[in-house]
């Protein structure tokens, strides 16, 4: 009888542990989903054109330089105040929003550029965080 009571008690403890683990997993999944939705909403509320004006200017200038040089280009040129100011602006943007905002700017500028210039502009925008020495190192868009 004592043996049966011990087995039942052990089984009850195992059920409680399993139930608590399943509950924890469910809560974690919900929290991750809520965090992602919160980030997307927070990033949407920021205006890329206002927050990253110098980055927009830097990408536009890079595009103009490519056109003027007709194919002879230094793609990572960092001269001028717009690059430094762009890095300062990027550092002030929430890390989770940087790539979304850079993509918004780059896609708009790409629409105005043509062919190869547009692709090069996207590449530069993807690598801007790395050039500025901030995270994420590269944006995937």
Swiss-Prot record:
Coiled coil: none
Name the record gives this protein: 2S seed storage albumin protein
SMART domains membership: AAI
CDD domains reported in the protein's UniProt record: AAI_SS
Organism of origin: Cucurbita maxima
Keywords in alphabetical order: Disulfide bond, Seed storage protein, Signal, Storage protein, Vacuole
Secretion signal, residue range per the UniProt entry: 1-22
Disulfide bonds: 43-97, 55-86, 87-132, 99-139
Lineage per the UniProt record: Eukaryota, Viridiplantae, Streptophyta, Embryophyta, Tracheophyta
Cellular location(s): Vacuole, Aleurone grain; Vacuole
GO MF annotations, alphabetized: nutrient reservoir activity
Propeptide: 23-35
Entry-linked InterPro entries: Bifun_inhib/LTP/seed_sf, Bifunc_inhib/LTP/seed_store, Napin/2SS/CON
């Amino acid at each position: 009888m004592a043996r049966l009571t011990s087995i039942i008690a052990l089984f009850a403890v195992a059920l409680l542990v399993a139930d608590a683990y399943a509950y924890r997993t469910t809560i974690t999944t919900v929290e991750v989903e809520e965090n992602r939705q919160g980030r997307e909403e927070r990033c949407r509320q920021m205006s890329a054109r206002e927050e990253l004006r110098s980055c927009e200017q830097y990408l536009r200038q890079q595009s103009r330089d490519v056109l003027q040089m007709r194919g002879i280009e230094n793609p990572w040129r960092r001269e001028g105040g717009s690059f430094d100011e762009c890095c300062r602006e990027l550092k002030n943007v929430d890390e989770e929003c940087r790539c979304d905002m850079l993509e918004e700017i780059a896609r708009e500028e790409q629409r105005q550029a043509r062919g190869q210039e547009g692709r090069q502009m996207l590449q530069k925008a993807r690598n801007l965080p790395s050039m500025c020495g901030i995270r994420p190192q590269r944006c995937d868009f």
